[in-house]
Amino acid sequence: SDVIIATRTSNIGMGGPAMVEGGGLGVFKPEQIGPAAVQHGNGVIDILVDDEAQAVAAARQYLSYFQGPVADFTAPPAAALRDVVPENRLRVYDTRQAMEGIADVGTLQHLRTGFGQGIHTALARIGGRPVGLMANNPAHLGGAIDTDAADKAARFLQLCNAHGLPLVS
């Protein structure tokens, strides 16, 4: 699948309690197998939401990026980026704020936020056109790319390529 959207109370596992017990791994309750918090942290869940209504809204937003450009959009305020990126390149800043400063208002959808903290990835619209946004996170390992961040970036690049979305990095 392209994306996995889950609620915080959901579980994702390869087998249930009987399979785990049959494999000699102990006795577990169904809710102990593959909790969303664990799966989000290891990169399995792309978008984690509070409830099913938010999941439906997230799915609709996600699918909207593959419908092409829209004529009705609101660009972010021109001053939105003015204070986000510091003049001193050695200072840490929040790349998610920079993404918000270039994306059309209300169109930013971050992916895999619990995994690969060295890279921030998101789908958005700029001038009504759907795009992928990707940025190194200078607050994590000084912006260095570790294995989780590389995995996250590679998967995001595949997603953008598969759907013909331009990448802004």
Q: Whereabouts are the PLM-identified features?
A:
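Conserved catalytic cores of soluble enzyme domains
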Residues: S1-A71, L165
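Extended, hydrophobic alpha-helical segments in both membrane/secreted and soluble proteins
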Residues: S1-I5, I12, D146-C160, L165-S169
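Intrinsically disordered, low-complexity segments enriched in small/flexible residues
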Residues: V49-V131, A135, A139-L157, N161
